[in-house]
A protein has these predicted regions:
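Short histidine-centered catalytic/ligand-binding loop motif
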Residues: 78-85
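Short proline/glycine- and acidic-rich turn/helix-capping motifs at secondary-structure junctions
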Residues: 68-76, 111-116, 152-163
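A short, Trp-centered hydrophobic/proline-enriched beta-strand micro-motif
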Residues: 4, 11, 148, 153-158
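Basic, often amphipathic N-terminal segments
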Residues: 1-65, 86-145, 163-180
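Generic structural "secondary-structure junction" signal
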Residues: 43, 71-74, 151, 173-175
Length: 180
């Protein structure tokens, strides 16, 4: 994942807090760090840290933009802030997917290169249902979701029994800027 810069992190947390106050939503707090997910590795069958370190050291920080409010539909819909997919963001995802996600037992097919939609989760899980999705979208639809951000890190999140999701390691993107 990439954690968000401070201003966008604060914007997303304010939305999370507003939805918790108004609708009682708390599922998003299971991973209490606003972030962009590139892939999910559920089992550590290989040593992934050196792969992530190599990608981080060879990738320069990149500029991205949030552009819209979206919904992944289905039995358990997800409301998200969508990012415009640009070539640098797609290249970072490609590097992570091919070097990391293809090398492990990855059950999160939604993150493969064909299906991946870069996004920041706003609401998911059992919080959303047919009776509240309309009022939630009505509340969110009039907010400005256009933000420019610098993606400057790759962060490894890990589920620790008794603690929940924690930051295991945060790596700075440190590749040469002149190549881009």
């Amino acid at each position: 994942v990439s954690l968000l810069p401070r201003d966008l992190d604060r914007f997303v947390r304010e939305i999370w807090d507003e939805l918790k106050t108004e609708f009682g939503f708390d599922s998003v707090f299971l991973t209490p760090f606003p972030h962009i997910t590139y892939c999910i590795v559920e089992e550590r069958k290989t040593k992934i840290d050196p792969l992530i370190e190599a990608i981080a050291s060879n990738t320069p920080p990149l500029i991205a933009r949030t552009e819209y409010l979206g919904v992944f539909s289905g039995e358990k819909p997800v409301i998200f802030i969508g990012l415009a997919r640009n070539s640098r963001l797609a290249s970072l995802h490609h590097a992570l997917w091919t070097e990391l996600c293809d090398s492990v037992d990855n059950r999160a097919i939604a993150y493969n290169e064909i299906h991946w939609i870069p996004h920041i989760t706003v609401v998911f899980g059992d919080d959303l249902n047919r009776s509240n999705i309309g009022p939630v979208m009505e509340r969110l639809a009039f907010k400005d979701f256009h933000h420019e951000l610098t993606i400057d890190n790759l962060t490894i999140l890990e589920e620790v029994p008794g603690e929940g999701i924690v930051i295991r390691e945060k790596l700075r993107l440190a590749g040469p800027l002149e190549d881009y």
